[in-house]
A protein has these predicted regions:
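Residue-level signal for well-ordered alpha-helical segments
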Residues: 11-15, 22-23, 50-52, 97-99, ...
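Histidine (H) residue identity feature
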Residues: 9, 30, 53, 61, ...
Length: 208
């Protein structure tokens, strides 16, 4: 556990979540303006709601050097046409051009080297707070599954963030609770560049 112009690379099929066909629609960003919409939503969730300190190249937008190499899944609210959910996808060819996966800024991925040509990285997933009932994330997952199948990719990686405002105790508890049953086999394990001292930080409380 660690402490710490748009190019299209795949083909995601526009779709609609079957139980909410009139409310939401899924698409892939095809223009810089659509990517900017995703970045604005990310800023709203990560900076304004969760308090992340972001280094923004454009005010009010969460962006970094990986964005222009990624594909961006979008879920729009049909009535307003606004983006209310997004997922960022970095396919292997784009990661090669970029020179790395985002995860490699946090972890050593040496043991996944033989998987790289079939390995997709996802991240920057977020949903507008008014639409977290389950339908939007289900639609994003459906789009991600379709993306993987259509492009013949086999492996999915990515980082998930856990808040550290309590000094890392909850993050340590999360690792303690999930590690015994969910650690990858040793030949696939990745190691953090800035390791969280979970042995010292874990408490008797349940992770949240």
């Amino acid at each position: 556990m660690s402490q710490n112009q748009n190019t299209l690379h795949g083909q995601a099929t526009p779709a609609t979540e079957s139980t909410e066909t009139s409310r939401f629609r899924l698409s892939q960003a095809h223009s810089e303006s659509e990517v900017l919409e995703a970045q604005r939503l990310r800023y709203k969730v990560f900076a304004e709601e969760l308090g992340a300190h972001l280094q923004c190249r454009v005010p009010g937008h969460d962006s970094d050097i990986f964005d222009s190499y990624c594909d961006h899944l979008l879920v729009r609210e049909t009535a307003s046409d606004r983006v209310i959910g997004t997922y960022r996808i970095l396919p292997p060819d784009a990661a090669r051009k970029m020179g790395m996966y985002y995860s490699e800024s946090e972890f050593y991925l040496n043991r996944l080297q033989h998987l790289r040509t079939r390995m997709v990285e996802v991240g920057r997933s977020c949903i507008h707070p008014d639409h977290r009932g389950g339908a939007v994330i289900a639609l994003l997952w459906a789009g991600l599954a379709d993306y993987m199948v259509r492009n013949n990719y086999e492996y999915l990686i990515g980082c998930a963030s856990i808040g550290m405002v309590d000094g890392g105790h909850n993050a340590a508890n999360v690792f303690r609770d999930i590690a015994p049953a969910h650690m990858a086999p040793i030949e696939y394990q990745c190691f953090p560049k800035n390791r969280l001292p979970f042995e010292r930080l874990a408490t008797n409380q349940s992770a949240v």
